[in-house]
Amino acid sequence: MSNWTPAADQKNQGTLEFEISRAQVEEGLEKAFQRNKNQVSIPGFRKGKVTKALFFSKFGEEALYQEAMDIVLPAAYEAAVEEAGITPVGRPNIEPVSMNKGEAWTLKAEVTTAPAIKLGEYLNLEVAAEDTAVSDADVDAEIKRLQDGQAELVLQEESVKAEDGDTVVIDFDGSVDGDHFDGGQANDFSLALGSGQFIPGFEEQLVGHTAGEDVEVKVTFPEDYQAADLAGKEALFEVKIHELKRKELPELDDEFAKDVDEEVETLAELKEKTAKKLADDKEAAAKSAFEDAVITKAVDNASVDGDAIPDAMIEEDVHRQVDQYLGQLQQQGISREMFFQISGQTEEDLHKQFEEGAATRVKTNLVLEAIVKAEGIEPSAEQVTEEINNLATQYNMDAEQVRSSLSDSLLKHDIAMREVIKKITDSAKAK
């Protein structure tokens, strides 16, 4: 039994009072007892052999209330939510109302609910489509990029003056007001002029100089420089240029083509293959941009009850984005601690970074879910099985592992979201 009472003074807030039946309580107490009986020592009984009745007479059933609650609460809360017909977001604040011995338990939850969505037009929308044509200039630019990738850095004579795009091998020693600072010194450092690798003004002052020269470089650290003790300060770098290297590009001929792509024999074949790849890439990018534009227009056409996304939904989205981001880094071998050490960011910084756009992400999800409901999209059991098999193949896992780690409701949600995006995109027209 559950009772939902909306808050009188706050939208999307309310109190859900619900009951955990005595049978559920007994089930939770039994499971909690089985987990703990091996830890209990009572004279006259071997460990693990104490009866539940004796345990309760000595310690009271209240000793297991918290663990029993942890066991039965999730299912009881989910059932109460379903009965009340609400859609909670974020973590509810749940407190006991009564937990009397031998009786059912009554609890209340302070709940934030998802706001109602009023849909606007979402089918047959008109949005701009990107041009997918590939010009000769596009192909030439890509061939030039491939040519640059095959370039060799060739050591120049001492009489040759450095130009933008050259690479210099330097020693440098930086100081502020005569004091040297951490990170301001290096030997045999390779610097590509014009790369923007150093603070503004540094690389430009090496242009026109030759190998063997000593150069004084004067710069001002940016006001927002990451090292606060250097931000906005003038610095002097004493630079020694050891070597000057310049790119030498390979000839654009059949040999170059074969070096770049072993599947072609001539430069003409390479250009033809490049044109096809550029066309495929443009087509994919245009399709993605068109889909994004359709979703954005459908979301803009919809309105949120109260015109505001609840803070709990924003916080939940940010936490999810942060966890996903750090999880992806973890898969690449970069731990949470390592990331914060390398980046110089704090967890709070990362949360602020993901706060930008959170309201849009949440509204987009709410609108798409509302369209799913309006269109009666309900993925079948066969689609869920297919999704599990696809995920198992993608992540090289057993299908049963995937099934046990992901709920049917989550899988159905993902399938439905893809279906609704396809539906509104397929109905849209390019203008």
From Swiss-Prot:
Name of protein: Trigger factor
Coiled-coil annotated spans: none
HAMAP family: Trigger_factor_Tig
Main location: cytoplasm
Pfam short name (any one): Trigger_C
Localization (cell): Cytoplasm
RNA-binding listed as a keyword: no
Record's keyword terms, sorted: Cell cycle, Cell division, Chaperone, Cytoplasm, Isomerase, Rotamase
Stretches assigned to the PPIase FKBP-type domain: 165-250
Species of provenance: Leuconostoc citreum (strain KM20)
PANTHER family the record matches: TRIGGER FACTOR CHAPERONE AND PEPTIDYL-PROLYL CIS/TRANS ISOMERASE, TRIGGER FACTOR-LIKE PROTEIN TIG, CHLOROPLASTIC
Catalysed transformations (reactions): [protein]-peptidylproline (omega=180) = [protein]-peptidylproline (omega=0)
GO molecular function: peptidyl-prolyl cis-trans isomerase activity; protein folding chaperone; ribosome binding
